[in-house]
């Protein structure tokens, strides 16, 4: 380090304190990066990597970005998971002898972005921390841009993971390193995990109901936030304590499978429930809507309160339309307040704040048209006339973005400022008059008086007009020679310049001071403004519910006390929207305490998965307090929704499709209650037919005898349909389809009863598989069916000889015949009830473990073999004999 220049020594010293960050080191008009930081930044930002001291043996890699456009570059680095430490010059280089003092003034991390362009206005930007003790987990999270701060605790890791995936933080702070298994699961949400082993002695004022775990996890989070931001964050609200059990529970897979906020295929908002329901007019309302989708209510009183408000908005559609107009003029009050506190607010932001609070009286007056209950619900809406007057009297309507270049305040706001501006204005008028006078005096019509920051004011004459011109005759002193012009000054011009520029500089400096004072005055309104933002966001969500309810003809749900679920002409809200409404086929669903399992059969592509999803989504919408896409809807209040839909490997955790399926099924079977909803789509596909069939049947029986959860179970195992003979709680339904002239027609209608055909070949035709494959499938299928029809003994395993299709084996001339052997168990499903000691019963849809007689004899023979006394040749001979017996 001693071999480095003083500037590089300063850089290395500062960098040593911020090893986990890319250091933006201010040098004049640029932020420079060196060494590995430069290599990373040049690659991610796609900027040129150069070298400092290129002529030396070991030049230093470097790159840089202009300070005035740094925000965009920082945003790119943050979006790629990096942290950026911003190191500024703390002294004016022009007035400093020796090395300029530099300090890191802020660390930008994925969870602490405050710049307007760095965050999605319709998404929260959360940073989260959690700690673990012997008996519990404590978790706290914050959106630094809005000031939201919440904390909770729970006992198990599963709830921790559910909370993290629900909150979806961009950054996580922990006190100590976490295990690899937990880290892999968390990585589904974020890979930015910071270990902060030492907490400062600063104690932050947080109200955590004297719970030490909640206190310490909140201290950990705030310590990191203040350490990185290094400035006032007074807008961060008093911490709100909540319980995870106060909301409907859905894990990461349930939310993904139901596509609540992100589509599986596009990985975007489009095509999701959030996309459908977002008729909000404010960024605050959009963020609140996502929170409500992620956390449906389970308290009936709270749900009904929201529904009552939606009902009011539907019945007052003129007032609702007027309200939407008012809300459209409201900007992001939450984040505007955050920037006021943070100190990066500009004058245009404050004009947005002014327009926003000017709509509050209009909104409050409009609510008088509704009933007293609704008016009381939003009584916290408070006109801020004093703040509105302050902003109205002070700032120009269209101020510049920069707060350090003047032009911010209205005439009359400050007398001293007015005097400076008047002097500057008079000076400029004098300059205009001087330019006219000099043109007349010299006879040069193109003469002009201009200004730049290097020379100040000057007279410019083009070279074409200089021929025969004697500057001294007019008292001109040459200042600069250009290729096509000469620049001059006069004593009079220089004297006036001092007056004009002095006034301008003083005006700009005073305006900045006044702006800082104004910002501090607005800080006093932080808590009141945040209350207004909360009320407006809720109003926005509820009017959005009313808007979509009326637009798409939704119905108000009612909630049953006896666990009844009755949906009449229900639709999938998203699918219905993306297709012609008249083409969508609505369906009913009716479950209660006695019949709580639907076993759903039907062809592939017929709509089984869509039907099951729509029941789950309708339940979520209802518990959000929204109307639902049905003719009528009676629902229980669900505590949890479990899903297993579709096939997906969990590559992050190293789990196969089948393992993921089993893990999701395990969660449902272990944790579902009689108040839960389970969606199982074709459980058992990822293993052998018998294994899958046995698993599916066992899971159905388990739900029937234990949790009694409302369950929709789709399957292609048609043997399961006889379960309705032994399980009174199970009802067979199917999604209908017709075959006409060899073509499969999907009716998409759910009807009572089971079907015994999945129409696999017809669906394969619709997928345009090669005709040779389709024909071959039919040959093989005919052979299987013929063998079954010829067999009467249920304990006989049939050998099926299938004719070879030589067209499919043309690559080998030597092969003339292939025999495919398929053993078909012709046992018919017996409605045999096996009594249990406790009086319960279980039914096998078919006997999974009954072996043919011949096979049992061979098994017994194998069991009696003394393998220790057999030579390899004897064993091979015996194996050959057994094989012949099976044939």
Curated annotation (Swiss-Prot):
Family matches, as Pfam families: MutS_I, MutS_II, MutS_III, MutS_IV, MutS_V
Keyword Repeat: no
Keywords: ATP-binding, DNA damage, DNA repair, DNA-binding, Nucleotide-binding
Superkingdom assignment: Bacteria
Binding site for ATP: 602-609
One Gene Ontology CC term in the entry: cytosol
The UniProt record lists the keyword DNA damage: yes
InterPro entries found in the cross-reference section: DNA_mismatch_repair_MutS (IPR005748), DNA_mismatch_repair_MutS-lik_N (IPR007695), DNA_mismatch_repair_MutS/MSH (IPR017261), DNA_mismatch_repair_MutS_C (IPR000432), DNA_mismatch_repair_MutS_clamp (IPR007861), DNA_mismatch_repair_MutS_core (IPR007696), DNA_mismatch_repair_MutS_N (IPR016151), DNA_mismatch_repair_MutS_sf (IPR036187)
Coiled-coil regions listed: none
Alphabetized GO MF terms: ATP binding; ATP-dependent DNA damage sensor activity; damaged DNA binding; mismatched DNA binding
Entry's Gene Ontology BP terms: mismatch repair
Role this protein plays: This protein is involved in the repair of mismatches in DNA. It is possible that it carries out the mismatch recognition step. This protein has a weak ATPase activity.
Xref: HAMAP family: MutS
Similarity comment: family membership: Belongs to the DNA mismatch repair MutS family.
Name under which the protein is recorded: DNA mismatch repair protein MutS
Species per Swiss-Prot/TrEMBL record: Staphylococcus saprophyticus subsp. saprophyticus (strain ATCC 15305 / DSM 20229 / NCIMB 8711 / NCTC 7292 / S-41)
